Regions:
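Sec/Tat signal peptide C-region and signal peptidase I cleavage site
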Residues: 17-24
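Cleavable N-terminal signal peptides
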Residues: 10-11, 22
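Flexible loop/hinge segments at secondary-structure junctions
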Residues: 24-333
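Bacterial N-terminal signal peptides that target proteins for export
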Residues: 1-8
Length: 333
């Protein structure tokens, strides 16, 4: 009985120590865009190696879903593949959530097909609009309906869900209005589901961020984009996103930081500062397949966080806005 009692005592002591250790570990919560997820996840992994006392969790609720949590005060950081909308700004303001808008990288939103697709190596914005506009639902169901030169084959569509910032940006850039899209496509907030869908269907077409294409380029084919029939076909790439040649699907991606959390909880500020460290902001962003910010822009956004400047630089169109433009824009809260 004595041995059992001692063993029990040691077990209780060990459990208590574990609980105390867990309680001592500070927590930073991030959620939102699946496109931004690889960047924030890479940052979190490296950060936690050097900061064992801080745990960073990163969810994938989609940009819209992430902002819902953020504006309810449930998260410290919201990953976003498009800027905060007017309705989201209002929700945050009504809840007393002040936010700091920080672009973290550039992305080339990538249209993809199955590798065996020999006819749609390049497409115009008009081609894509014809496929994705609301009027196409139930009507444009065959590749030949897009262009006469395309084969008589069914077309299967894959795309992010309606809570996704990538969905918002694509519909704005291609159709001309956010959320303006046909609804008869396979939708998922998990880009890996889209990868598997297109990779397994010779007639498929889909879209998502460049990083997921780069990670799966051996089983997918990227479509070159033309602004019109006379324009050159431009492939989605780090270089073409950096130079602005890849239009209209180049875009900045963001994190939004809860100002109060950054002010009152050192672990949040420490993680954001790590995120913006020039070495990490270049090497880790490149590592996951996105385009690092220009040096001058990164410095400007470091200063924005240091000064805790709140609000958004987006009050007009979100399509075609450069990072350099964002540095100059007046913030509105």
């Amino acid at each position: 009985m004595k041995i059992i009692t001692l063993a029990s005592a040691f077990a209780l002591l060990a459990a208590g120590a574990a609980l105390n250790g867990a309680a001592a570990q500070a927590l930073v919560k991030a959620d939102g865009s699946s496109t931004v997820f690889p960047v924030t996840e890479a940052m979190a992994e490296e950060f936690q190696k050097a900061n064992k006392d801080i745990k960073v969790t990163v969810g994938i609720a989609g940009t819209g879903g992430g902002f819902k949590k953020f504006c309810r005060g449930e998260t410290d950081i919201s990953n976003a593949s498009r800027p905060i909308t007017a309705s989201e700004q209002k929700a945050c303001k009504e809840a007393g959530i002040e936010y700091i808008e920080l672009p973290v990288a550039l992305d080339a939103l990538t249209v993809i097909v199955h590798p065996s697709n020999t006819w749609a190596g390049e497409m115009t914005v008009a081609d894509l609009k014809k496929i994705w506009e609301p009027e196409a639902q139930g009507k444009i169901t065959n590749w030949k309906q897009v262009r006469d030169s395309y084969p008589d084959r069914p077309i299967t569509l894959y795309g992010p869900g309606v809570d996704s910032g990538t969905y918002d940006y694509f519909t704005a850039a291609i159709v001309g209005k956010e959320h303006s899209s046909r609804g008869d496509f396979t939708a998922s907030e998990d880009d890996n589901v889209l990868v598997q869908g297109v990779a397994g269907d010779q007639n498929a077409l889909g879209f998502f961020g460049l990083a997921y294409y780069e990670e799966n380029h051996n089983k997918l084919k990227a479509v070159k984009i033309k602004l019109n029939d006379a324009a050159p076909a431009v492939e989605p790439s780090v270089e073409n996103a950096r130079t602005g040649k890849y239009q209209p699907l180049s875009r900045p991606i963001f994190i939004y930081v809860n100002k109060k959390a950054a002010d009152t909880r050192p672990e949040v500020a420490k993680f954001v500062e790590f995120y913006q460290n020039p070495k990490n902001a270049v090497e880790l962003v490149k590592e996951v397949g996105y385009v690092p910010l220009p040096e001058a822009a990164l410095k400007a956004f470091q200063e924005r966080f240091k000064k805790r400047e709140i609000g958004t630089g987006f009050t007009g169109s979100k399509v075609g806005v450069s990072v350099e433009d964002l540095v100059k824009e007046k913030l509105v809260y």
